Structures are given as structure tokens and as C-alpha cells.
Amino acid sequence: MVRVGIIGGSGLYELLENPRIVRLDTPFGHCDVQLGELAGEEVAFIPRHGASHRLPPYKVNYKANLYALNMLEVERIIATNAVGSINPALEPGTIVIPHDFIDMTKCRDVTFYDGETTIKVRGREVSGVVHVSMTPYTYCPEIRASIIEAAEHMGLGVRDGGVYVCTEGNRFETPAEIRAFSILGGDIVGMTGCPEASLARELAICYASISVVTNYAAGVSGAVKLTQGEVIEIFSRKIQDISRLIEETIRRIPKRRECPCKDALSEYLK
């Protein structure tokens, strides 16, 4: 059993010690998972965009990725994302631990439970139309608390809380869209947070995210033209902090789950 899984992108490929690649065939496609050691335990890592970072956000096979971790009996997932700042107070370089999200994607496969597919969760079959709750916590409170505690231990400043807005991509958002997201209460905007978080909940897996602000979103604080190079540059500067933060977080995550995430399917697993 692998207790903790990590989903991330560039810069984290060398995170694990003694890594090996395992290909898992899921009902939703295959997934290459890197298994290795971190913080004294075996950990699974999935490069969200593929090993060569070839998949755009809307083509990522989120269901295969999450189900592969389910097959490994992962209970906790720590994810990382690069985000733009909707809230002017969140400067580039800020690390945000979001507490909620708004899903503005349009054409992604967002659920395991389409009424026809049967899947296994903790060795038990689940099928039909399943409606999981995203309240009272959208992201796992135990992982979030562990991330924040780890950051405090490191002396690393993080923003506790924020609303993540997920867009389809590949283009960056328009100034009008960002104004609309701000009115809706959004703080940061990215392209990979959904449906990842809700799919984890559908598998009763705890999930939380570490979001790195790489730029101001369109029209915020004078932002004019956004470039992918800008995003990569800022994220690369923070990769050492993020890597250490993940390791310190794993050391602090409780071995026994007491959060509501574990009971997400309780009414369906009878």
C-alpha cells in the first residue's frame, strides 16, 4: 500500500529517491506512475502532463491518473499547480493553499459515475449515478493543515486559503473573464485543478493543492501580455521550496484519517 500520492509537473520529476516506473492499466487508460521514497516512506508520483510534458491541460487523462492512485490504495494526494493571481494582494511568487474552487471548464470528463461504469474503491464495487458532497471541506482539511504546519516549520510564507478558478485552456483568460471571476470570489486561476479535486473525492481520497502564483492574471495590476515563459520562470524559482514543503508535509500528515473525505462514499458502500 502506498499512503501518499503526488500529482505535479515540471521540476518535481527528481523528487523521489530510488524511483521506478510502473505502468498501470486502468478502465480509463494506462498511467505511468513513478514509485520511490520520500520522507521515509514509499510515495507515488504522477507527472500530470506526461513524462515529457506533452499534454495540454484539457487533454490530461485525469480519470486514469486518479484511478491509478486508487489502484495503489493511496489515501492522500498532494497536488501542485501554477496559477495566475486574480487577487492583486497575491503577488507572483506567493504560495497559496486553496480552500475552495470554481470549475469553469467546459469539455472535460468530470466523473467516474456515468450511470454505466462500475469501479472498485477499497476493494468494493461502486456503480450507478453517485453524487459526492464537496462540503464542508472542498479540499482535505488534514492535508491542508499539514501543509501549513510544514510551511511554518520551514519559515516559508504561504497564504492559508483562496478560491481557485479552473479554466479550460489552452489560451490564457481574457480581462473580462478575470473581472467576472473576481466578482464570483476567485483569488487565483489555473487550468489543472479540476476535475482532479472532485475525482479524488469520488474515490474517497484526501486531496489538497499547493498553488504557486506565477503571474498576475489578465488586466490585474497592469498585467498586459502573459507568456508561458513567464509562468515557467517563476515556478522554477519556487521548485526547491515546493519540493521541501511536500517532503515536510508528508512527515506531518496523520497516519489515521479522521477527515470527512474518507466517508465520501459511505452511503454508496453498504
UniProtKB/Swiss-Prot annotation:
Its EC number is 2.4.2.1. Gene3D superfamilies: Nucleoside phosphorylase domain (3.40.50.1580). It catalyses: a purine D-ribonucleoside + phosphate = a purine nucleobase + alpha-D-ribose 1-phosphate. Pfam families: PNP_UDP_1. Substrate binds at residues 191, 215-217. CDD domains: MTAP_SsMTAPII_like_MTIP. The record marks 173, 228 as: Important for substrate specificity. GO terms for molecular function: S-methyl-5-thioadenosine phosphorylase activity. One of its GO terms (biological process) is purine ribonucleoside salvage. Keywords: Glycosyltransferase, Purine salvage, Transferase. Phosphate binds at residues 10, 48-49, 192. Pathway: Purine metabolism; purine nucleoside salvage. SUPFAM superfamilies: Purine and uridine phosphorylases. The keyword ATP-binding does not apply. GO terms for cellular component: cytosol. Belongs to the PNP/MTAP phosphorylase family. MTAP subfamily. Homohexamer. Dimer of a homotrimer. Purine nucleoside phosphorylase which is highly specific for 6-oxopurine nucleosides. Cleaves guanosine or inosine to respective bases and sugar-1-phosphate molecules. Involved in purine salvage. Although this enzyme belongs to the family of MTA phosphorylases based on sequence homology, it has been shown that conserved amino acid substitutions in the substrate binding pocket convert the substrate specificity of this enzyme from 6-aminopurines to 6-oxopurines. This is Probable 6-oxopurine nucleoside phosphorylase. The lineage of its organism: Archaea, Thermoproteota, Candidatus Korarchaeia, Candidatus Korarchaeales, Candidatus Korarchaeaceae.
